[in-house]
Regions:
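Polyanion-engaging groove/track-forming segments
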Residues: 1-139
Length: 139
């Protein structure tokens, strides 16, 4: 099959994992600019949030190197994205919610014949299966 590591969903999941693991500092309750900027620039984030582009520009313009989660939660999707996860179970559930949000982008009528959409839908499905297995085995 098509390598999952070469799909947009993989890069998005990696950016989300980086955001939650190395990009969030529990001691200060803040995210790092680098991790926030990377995920705000991702095409999926920009498709799922009308505020992503503007927020990324604002953080850059105002030199917000360590934004608080409350500064980043501009809509429902960004609220999910920028809610810190404190343990592995929460992280797995978080990834599943993000994958489900992304899957909405590929449910449009008339796109089922497009080979890239088929590949991306399959990559989302495989990512969901892998995350779901992690959640079940982590219980």
């Amino acid at each position: 099959g098509f390598p999952l590591a070469q799909t947009p969903v993989y890069s998005f999941i990696n950016a989300a994992m980086e955001l939650q693991t190395n990009g969030y500092r529990p001691d200060t309750g803040r995210f790092t600019y680098e991790a926030v900027s990377k995920i705000l620039k991702h095409p999926y984030t920009r498709q799922l949030s009308d505020h992503a582009t503007r927020l990324e520009r604002e953080l850059t313009k105002t030199n917000r190197f360590y934004p608080l989660p409350s500064e980043l939660k501009k809509d429902d999707f960004l609220t999910i994205l920028f809610t810190p996860q404190s343990n592995i179970r929460e992280l797995c559930d978080y990834l599943l919610r993000l994958i489900k949000s992304i899957s909405i982008l590929y449910r449009k009528e008339g796109e089922y014949d497009d080979i890239f959409n088929q590949l991306y839908r399959e990559s989302i499905f495989q990512s969901h299966l892998n995350s779901d297995r992690s959640t079940v085995s982590g219980s």
